[in-house]
Amino acid sequence: MIRITDTAQEHFAKLLANQEEGTQIRVFVINPGTPTAECGVSYCPPDAVEATDTELKFEKLSAYIDELSKPYLDDAEIDFVTDQLGSQLTLKAPNAKMRKVDDNAPLMERVEYVLQSQINPQLAGHGGRVTLMEITDDSLAILQFGGGCNGCSMVDVTLKEGIEKELLQKFPELKGVRDLTEHQRGEHSYY
């Protein structure tokens, strides 16, 4: 379910030592399963534990997860990273915006999951996104770019060298990827 690294557990243990006795942490997702999903960690005093919560016991603490957030925190990882710029807590939850789909789910669902959980987070750095419009009878994934990708001069490279390569590697049943977008360069374009 959730992995909390040893360094993150040490960090939380230090913080929890200054809290009311019995206080643990709560890991949650606000707006789970949507493009605006956000993950968080908060203190969870004993009186805030709900009967429907799931308790995950770790060596130095327990983490509580509410029933609604639980499926969206599959494969999540909390780490405490130190580099030249300082230290920071990181929470990676690849399934927060979209629940992980089963390996034998329909191809459309599996491709959509990869786009939302792996491709779109990379495109978001440039204000872009991609949407799966359909999978044709001849096994072509038809995509539409939006945001900063629409009109971007690099969209063909992104499509062929990035997205298409990744999708064809993950889904051998696909024959190719096509772009449905009419690219008109504008103020929103990244390049």
Swiss-Prot record:
Function: Involved in iron-sulfur cluster biogenesis. Binds a 4Fe-4S cluster, can transfer this cluster to apoproteins, and thereby intervenes in the maturation of Fe/S proteins. Could also act as a scaffold/chaperone for damaged Fe/S proteins.
Binding-site residues, [4Fe-4S] cluster: 149, 152
Recorded coiled-coil stretches: none
Superkingdom per UniProt: Bacteria
Cofactor note: Binds 1 [4Fe-4S] cluster per subunit. The cluster is presumably bound at the interface of two monomers.
Cofactor(s) demanded: [4Fe-4S] cluster
HAMAP family per record: Fe_S_biogen_NfuA (MF_01637)
Alphabetical UniProt keywords: 4Fe-4S, Iron, Iron-sulfur, Metal-binding
A GO biological-process term: iron-sulfur cluster assembly
Database matches in SUPFAM superfamilies: Fe-S cluster assembly (FSCA) domain-like, HesB-like domain
Gene Ontology MF terms: 4 iron, 4 sulfur cluster binding; iron ion binding
Family membership noted in the UniProt record: Belongs to the NfuA family.
PANTHER family: FE_S BIOGENESIS PROTEIN NFUA (PTHR11178:SF51), IRON-SULFUR CLUSTER SCAFFOLD PROTEIN NFU-RELATED (PTHR11178)
Subunit structure: Homodimer.
The protein's name in its UniProt record: Fe/S biogenesis protein NfuA
